[in-house]
Amino acid sequence: GTTYSVRIRAVNVAGSGAQSNLVSVTPRTVPATPTVSSVTPGDSTATVTFTAGSDGGSTVTNYEYTLDNGVTWLSTGAVASPLTISALTNGTSYSVRIRAVNIAGNGAQSGATSVTPYGLPGAPTISSVTGGIAQVSVALTAGTTGGSTITNYEYSVDNGSTWTTRTPAAVTSPMTISGLANGTRYDIRIKAVNAAGSGPASTSVSSTTKNSPAAPTIVS
């Protein structure tokens, strides 16, 4: 990385000849290994945060990554941290390594870091809603996980205008929604929740709660 000004001259038994013209030269080598501090999963992506090593005396022009322990290397186009790896499959574990590239060639690869990308869960399917007294019972089937375990559901009783988190958290079916008014129609929708957040809502299914039985009359 240091620039030197070089001249040469020939020597024989008679002595030293005239020196050559001045030529500048900067020695260089491949860049040093980057240090990966984190690999953060996203929706079909992974974001790699790293600290660059020495550039070897020549500007780093690219960072490359491998997902197969160095068999195949792909360009990111990035020249600084962070870099984003895309087109991954949610729910699949990847072993990520990176290396720096300059005009001298490819540097040594970093250590491996595992990451599993994930996105929002798919919409659940409501198979039935049964009205009861001040409550409804919702039978549902989970959609896709998005690559991350479904941890809870949210529900709406007004066709998606407002949403309530299921408490306590549960992923079992059926789901009981209580605290409703008797003899009232409700338009039920459900969302699944995972580490990425709340997914899209199910289609709406309507149900009417039952009325409480009338008080009996004692005639004698």
How would you name each of these model-derived features?
Residues 14-58, 90, 104-148, 182, ...:
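Pro/Thr/Ser/Gly-rich low-complexity, intrinsically disordered linker/stalk tracts
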Residues 73-79, 164-171:
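Short beta-strand segments within Ig-like beta-sandwich modules, predominantly Fibronectin type-III
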Residues 62-65, 152-155:
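Short beta-strand elements bearing conserved aromatic residues within extracellular beta-rich modules
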Residues 2, 59-61, 150:
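Low-complexity, Ser/Thr/Pro-rich intrinsically disordered linker/stalk segments at domain junctions
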Residues 1-14, 85-105, 177-197:
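Beta-strand-rich modules
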